[in-house]
Amino acid sequence: AVALALALAGGSYAQDDTAKKKVKAYMVSDAHLDTQWNWDIQTTINEYVWNTISQNLFLLKKYPEYVFNFEGGVKYAWMKEYYPEQYEEMKKFIEEGRWHIAGSSWEASDVLVPSVEASIRNIMLGQTYYRQEFGKEGTDIFLPDCFGFGWTLPTIAAHCGLIGFSSQKLDWRNHPFYGKSKHPFTIGLWKGIDGKQVMLAHGYDYGRKWNNEDLSKNKDLEKLAQRTPLNTVYRYYGTGDIGGSPTLGSVRSVEQGIKGDGPVEVISATSDQLFKDYLPFNNHPELPVFDGELLMDVHGTGCYTSQAAMKLYNRQNEQLGDAAERAAVAAEWLGTASYPQHTLTEAWKRFIFHQFHDDLTGTSIPRAYEFSWNDELISLKQFSQVLTSSVNAIAGQMDTRVKGTPVVLYNANAFPVSDLTEIILEQPKTPKGFTVYNAQGKKVASQMIGYENGRAHILVAASLPANSYAVYDVRTGGSEKTISPSAASAIENSVYKITLDKNGDIISLTDKRNNKELVKDGKAIRLALFTENKSYAWPAWEILKETIDREPVSITDGAKITLVENGALRKALCIEKKYGKSLFKQYIRLYEGSRADRIDFYNEIDWQSTNTLLKAEFPLNIENEKATYDLGIGSVERGNNVQTAYEVYAQQWADLTDKNNSYGVSILNDSKYGWDKPDNNTIRLTLLHTPETKGNYAYQDRQDFGFHTFTYSLTGHDGALDKPATAIKAEILNQPIKAFSSPKHAGTLGKEFAFVRSSNDQVVIKALKKAEVSDEYVVRVYETGGAAPQQAAITFAGEIEKAVLADGTEKEIGSADFNKNQLNVSIAPYSIQTFKVKLKKKADLQAPACAYLPLDYDRRCFSWNTFRKEGNFESGNSYAAELLPDSILKADGIPFRLGEKEIANGLTCKGNVLQLPTGHSYNRIYFLAASAGEDAVATFSTGNNSQEITVPSYTGFIGQWEHLGHTEGFLKDAEIAYVGTHRHASNKDEAYEFTYMFKFGMD
């Protein structure tokens, strides 16, 4: 019976006499592999992924008790792409349960900076890959190396159907935090912010090695097991950072320990076996429970801020991906466009794997970020393309017949939004002014805020229902109050009055509604510099407490304050100054109308200051020893800076409310994550971190040198903090109303169309997408109040035919209550719920009439891996045929027929004349093209229409952030139709040398 139980638990060797064993050791092998760190992704693929698969296949064949654990779906995908024979061999061991899928995600990512939704997507993408490739799925969060763990992690894990979490980093604190310990326990239960729990195990050092010894007699294992009343140790062993495998001596030691007669029962374990052995958890009252955060104190504090461009691109991808999916769902339901599943999934995968803990965290070498920035920008372009084509498809069914120029506004948020939006209109000459009318024909406030290069920029007061589209009418005419920039030191609107000192710092901020001065007497709201930012051991990783304990300085050199806007909707002061070689330009913006209670601080900074930390400092006429910080779902209160917790993370907002709940101030942001609270009156947002280095990581003393743009905002509130309302304000900053041009035409949808809404502001729709493996739509909701269970009706534009409850990985787990077009939700505080719904389609998709134009191919652009020399797009290089679809490549719903892969499949443009089809009403031609060398300018003509088109190179980078002295910043304009993740040279695969095709169209 004992032997059978052990076999079921994890296939471990049957002990002859387990009664003699005093303690139990779950030996969890791993070859932790940093996707990028002190190397780039090409090295990872060419060396470390190969070492991992080849070495472990050897060990699995030689040692019958060996079980290998490996995490990260993207690395499995690279094995399939680059080492297909070994991949097929590996699949057999996965089937046997000896090569174990550790973790459950697409990448073993940071879990603090990514949004909650991105973390759910990470797990969903990983589990989908594992199910499709192996017929298996993970059951745990496996993060041997990561820089702190938030209170939301158990909530996310449990929602995705996972049961456990392990890491070696629980010991990576400089100071005890839980009594005399650095962590609450080594094995127990961790409760999330919604009350759901997973099992937690501390894995100790993942690089532990042994040299051919009997681990059943190992005193260290015995002592570690005795640290817990369970007499059990969960022990990593293997290698860290560079992949590979455990040493031969370590594997032999585990094998000997399994058969040994010492006091330690040795189990060659999967990463989740311990957790499974304790199911159901409520049958084990001996398990201690922890309810709270597991952050680090020193290590990782810099990771909330390092590599600011990555943080910005990541936040933008999270927001733009969401907006694109919602629009694509509505367009498909209307029957006006197909849902671009492949493009969206690949775009999410591409930026999510850069959430890896040495990538998004800002701790990799500069060369690595060239690949990261490029991938982030590719995803941004793809999301933008999907968003634009989807909104255009919806707009095509709307009535855009207006007197002036029709503009379609899109509110991607799941709640009604009244806010300001910026519209850009082509105008041949400077207009005198504009008048704007909403979808109901009512005139709304507007303000022209700029005109350059034939484009007018107009600020418009808009109000849109949840997840909706509206036609606005923009007419030339009227008059704008124009001003010439002038010196000023004060600005006010209907809510606030701001006074600046000569340095451009805010010395007075009055809430006129409450006659409340917000700035602490003798202090100023300002950009604050810490000029002794020394961090020698782990420079980018760590902001030291001694740094932020010092008094920061104001930026005073060359201060110039100018009133640059004074319109009906927006007024703005521009403050320019410098510190050393760093240049600062900050716009303080006040508004009227729906945004009147929000002050925006828009920043343009050319940063060139080493040994310097930049924060936005808010010393307030408010007193509380605690502030509230946004966690993405829910929030947490934290106190003033102490040695064990000083630089902390938050997502989109933080709040300081007076302890008597009489008044409070919320600080919102669009791309920043680090915060601190030095005293009862002050909260600070960390903006840029460039440490002084010594020895290792010397390149980090120029970290973030370059041009940065970002916004943070201040909003005051009378009375206690309203968490759902503050979350909505932060969402509006991050997901503003978007504007799209449209031609005039009739449409059955009228001038306003809404797809989905929630009846309860505390039950927020956080995701709307098509399911990965079915034709259902996925709807995910969060409860944002945290005080009591909530009910809501989620109302769709169409009738619900079917609805089920699902987990975060889109696996059905129960039934759902619905009636006609309403989905009825009952949700616990700070909980997440996911549903899959099937809607009755409004119309079937009508594919556009199209014809394929035959081409006289003269170039072998593609090659198979086995016949790489037969392709020659450029200098012996070619597109990888194995990555391309068999015949039809779709780009934004347009199908392109590719040439056969084994023969000529590309046409060299050299003055060719092509015959277009006749006798049909085709009105547009689309083609795929790429330049064989550098970007090229070519002229394409149809009839009397000629266009000069820039055709980008088929390879290289699409874009880069400009890192001063390292890279030049650029972003190519062309629409991406295809991305290939490796290139063929005549003699090898060139890993992560991308190839592209670009889509062009002409009337």
Which residues fall in each region the model found?
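Bacterial N-terminal signal peptides
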Residues: A1-A9
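C-terminal (or distal) subdomains of carbohydrate-active enzymes
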Residues: L4, L153-I156, T186, T388, ...
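Catalytic grooves of carbohydrate-active enzymes
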Residues: M27-Q36, Q42, G195-R401, A412-A414, ...
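Alpha-helical scaffold elements lining the catalytic groove of polysaccharide deacetylases
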Residues: V111-Y129, Y204-A225, K571
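CE4/NodB-like, metal-dependent polysaccharide N-deacetylase domain
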Residues: S119-F147, W151, H159, K219-Y237, ...
